[in-house]
C-alpha cells in the first residue's frame, strides 16, 4: 500500500495572528548550529577552488577545495558532484566575508575516529586505500590519514612501495592518539594473525621428504627463502648445490621457480627447512652411473699432497692419484711427475660411493695405452645382451653398416659420444708422447716436467665417426664378443 505524500508546511501571513508570530514561524524553518557541529547538505555548485553546500541555512555553506579530502591537491570534481548528499563540519559560522565555512574532510575525520577507536577496542582490523607514498611508509585513507610504516607492510621489509598506490589494504591499528592526530597501522600484524591458522594447517600437511615447487622470494648470505604458497622455507647455502658455492646468488635468483625437498618442519617455531640439491642427482652417483672401473678419463690436477695428487674428473668430483700410481718408477714427491693445473688422462681404479671417494691412476692409464683406438676405453660404454652379443645403437643397421632414416637424433648422439671418446684418446696419445720425450731427455734424472699441458684444440678436437669407422668398430666388437 502506498503512503500518500505529505505536503511541506507553507507559511503565510494569514496563518499567524501577528508579525511576531510570523517571525517565530520563519525562525523555526532555519537551522541553527555552532562551530564544530556536523551538518548535512546537498552539493549545489562545484568550482575549482571551492564547493557550495545547501544545508538549509540562510546562506549556502562553502567547502574550500583543501577541506574536501584527506588527499592533497585534489580536483573538487573528482571528489563530489552536484546533487551529492554529504556531511560537513562547521569550521566557522561567519568568516570576515560573512561566509559559512565548512569542511567535508573534518566531518569524515570525526566520524572515522569513532569507528577506529571502536575497532582498536575490539582489536579488529581496518581497511583503507593507499593514497600516498611518504618517507618511511604509506598513507592509507581510513577516513583519516593512517600511517603504515614500510617495515610493517609485509612479513619482510619492502623496498619499492609504489605498486601499493590505489590498492585496498587491511591492517591492525597499533597506535592511536587523537590529540596528536596520529594513527599507526601494521599490515604485518594483520598478516601474522590471519595467516596463523592457514600456516598451521599448511605446516601440518607438509611432510618431511615431500617434493614441492616454489618461488625464490629472497636471498641472504646464509641461503635462500622459497615461497611454497604462503609459507616460506629456508634453503641453507649448503643445500643449494652439490658443489661448493660462496654465495646463494651463484645458484638462484629472486623470482626463480624451483623444486625443493622438505628436510624438516618445526611446528613450534613455524620454520621449514628445504633442500634444492636433494632434488638433483648427486654428482657422485652420476659419476658412478656413467663411469666404470677401468675407464680412462680426462682430468685436471687441482692439488698436490705428500702422498699423491688430486685430480678433478668432473665438476665437484675429485679423485686421488696415490704417489705410487703416478709413474712406473719410484717417485719421491708428486711434483716430479705432475703440477697443479696440468691436464691428465687417468684410469678409474676404484669407486667408493658410500665414502664419496674415487681412486685414480696415471701409471695404469699409461700402461693401458695402445695405439689402436678403442672407444670403450675412453667412456663409450659397450652394451651386450644376455647372450653376450653387442647391442648396436638404435637406428643402426649392422647388416648394411648404415643408419636408418628417421634416426638422426640417435645418430647425432652416438657420433657425439664417439667424438668425445676420440678426443680423449688423442689427449692420451699426447700425454704418452710427452712422457716418452721426458724419459728420453731425462734418462735417469729424478726431476720430470708435468705429465701434460693443455693440448691445442686442433690436437684434441674429436671428429664424428664415419660409416667406415662404424663398420670397423662393429667388426672389432663382434670379434671380441
Swiss-Prot record:
Statement: the UniProt record of this protein carries the keyword Transport: no
Iron as UniProt keyword: no
Boundaries of every S1 motif domain copy: 36-105, 123-188, 209-277, 294-363
A GO MF term: structural constituent of ribosome
Leader peptide range in chain numbering: none
Alphabetic keyword roster: Repeat, Ribonucleoprotein, Ribosomal protein, RNA-binding
Sequence segments annotated as region (Disordered): 437-465
GO cellular component term, pick one: ribonucleoprotein complex
Matching InterPro entries: NA-bd_OB-fold (IPR012340), Ribos_protein_bS1-like (IPR050437), Ribosomal_protein_S1-like (IPR035104), S1_domain (IPR003029)
Listed GO biological process terms: translation
Source species, domain of life: Bacteria
Skewed-composition ranges (Polar residues): 445-457
Functional summary from the UniProt entry: Binds mRNA; thus facilitating recognition of the initiation point. It is needed to translate mRNA with a short Shine-Dalgarno (SD) purine-rich sequence.
UniProt cross-references to NCBIfam families, sorted A to Z: PRK06676.1, PRK07899.1
Family note: Belongs to the bacterial ribosomal protein bS1 family.
Name of the protein this chain belongs to: Small ribosomal subunit protein bS1
Naturally occurring in which organism (per UniProt): Mycobacterium leprae (strain TN)
Native organism taxonomy: Bacteria, Bacillati, Actinomycetota, Actinomycetes, Mycobacteriales
Amino acid at each position: 500500500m502506498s503512503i500518500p505524500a505529505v505536503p511541506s508546511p507553507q507559511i503565510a501571513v494569514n496563518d499567524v495572528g501577528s508579525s511576531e508570530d510570523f517571525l517565530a514561524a520563519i525562525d523555526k524553518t532555519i537551522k541553527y548550529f555552532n562551530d564544530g557541529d556536523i551538518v548535512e547538505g546537498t552539493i549545489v555548485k562545484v568550482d575549482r577552488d571551492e564547493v557550495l553546500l545547501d544545508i538549509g541555512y540562510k546562506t549556502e555553506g562553502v567547502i574550500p577545495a583543501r577541506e574536501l579530502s584527506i588527499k592533497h591537491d585534489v580536483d573538487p570534481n573528482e571528489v563530489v558532484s552536484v546533487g551529492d548528499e554529504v556531511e560537513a563540519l562547521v569550521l566557522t559560522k561567519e568568516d570576515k566575508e560573512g561566509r559559512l565555512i565548512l569542511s567535508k574532510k573534518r566531518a569524515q575525520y570525526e566520524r572515522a575516529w569513532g569507528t577506529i577507536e571502536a575497532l582498536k577496542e575490539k582489536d579488529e582490523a581496518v581497511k583503507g586505500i593507499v593514497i600516498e607514498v611518504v618517507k618511511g611508509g604509506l598513507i592509507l585513507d581510513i577516513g583519516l590519514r593512517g600511517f603504515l610504516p614500510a617495515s610493517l607492510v609485509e612479513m619482510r621489509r619492502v623496498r619499492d612501495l609504489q605498486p601499493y598506490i590505489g590498492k585496498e589494504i587491511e591492517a591492525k591499528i597499533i597506535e592511536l592518539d587523537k590529540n596528536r592526530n596520529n594513527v599507526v597501522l601494521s599490515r604485518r600484524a594483520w598478516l601474522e594473525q590471519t595467516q596463523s591458522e592457514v600456516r598451521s594447517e599448511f605446516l601440518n600437511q607438509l611432510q618431511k621428504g615431500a617434493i614441492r615447487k616454489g618461488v625464490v622470494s629472497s636471498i641472504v648470505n646464509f641461503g635462500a627463502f622459497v615461497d611454497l604458497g604462503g609459507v616460506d622455507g629456508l634453503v641453507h647455502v649448503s643445500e643449494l648445490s652439490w658443489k661448493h658455492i660462496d654465495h646463494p646468488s651463484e645458484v638462484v635468483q629472486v623470482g626463480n621457480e624451483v623444486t625443493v625437498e622438505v628436510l624438516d618442519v618445526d611446528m613450534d617455531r613455524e620454520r621449514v627447512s628445504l633442500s634444492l640439491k636433494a632434488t638433483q642427482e648427486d654428482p657422485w652417483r652420476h659419476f658412478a652411473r656413467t663411469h666404470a672401473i677401468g675407464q680412462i678419463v680426462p682430468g685436471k690436477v687441482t692439488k698436490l699432497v705428500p702422498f699423491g695428487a688430486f685430480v678433478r674428473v668432473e665438476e665437484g668430483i675429485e679423485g686421488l692419484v696415490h704417489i705410487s700410481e703416478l709413474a712406473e718408477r719410484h717417485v719421491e714427491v708428486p711434483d716430479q711427475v705432475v703440477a697443479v693445473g696440468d691436464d691428465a688422462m687417468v684410469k678409474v681404479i676404484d669407486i667408493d660411493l658410500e665414502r664419496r671417494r674415487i681412486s685414480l691412476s696415471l701409471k695404469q692409464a699409461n700402461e693401458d695405452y695402445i695405439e689402436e683406438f678403442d672407444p670403450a676405453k675412453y667412456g663409450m660404454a659397450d652394451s651386450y645382451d644376455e647372450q653376450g652379443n653387442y647391442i648396436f645403437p638404435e637406428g643402426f643397421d649392422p647388416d648394411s653398416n648404415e643408419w636408418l632414416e628417421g634416426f638422426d637424433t640417435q645418430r647425432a648422439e652416438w657420433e657425439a659420444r664417439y667424438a668425445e671418446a676420440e678426443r680423449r684418446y688423442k689427449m692420451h696419445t699426447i700425454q704418452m708422447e710427452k712422457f716418452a720425450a721426458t724419459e728420453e731427455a731425462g734418462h735417469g734424472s729424478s726431476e720430470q716436467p708435468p705429465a701434460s699441458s693443455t693440448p691445442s684444440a686442433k690436437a684434441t678436437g674429436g671428429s664424428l665417426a664415419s660409416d667406415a669407422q662404424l663398420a670397423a668398430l662393429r667388426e672389432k666388437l663382434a670379434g671380441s664378443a
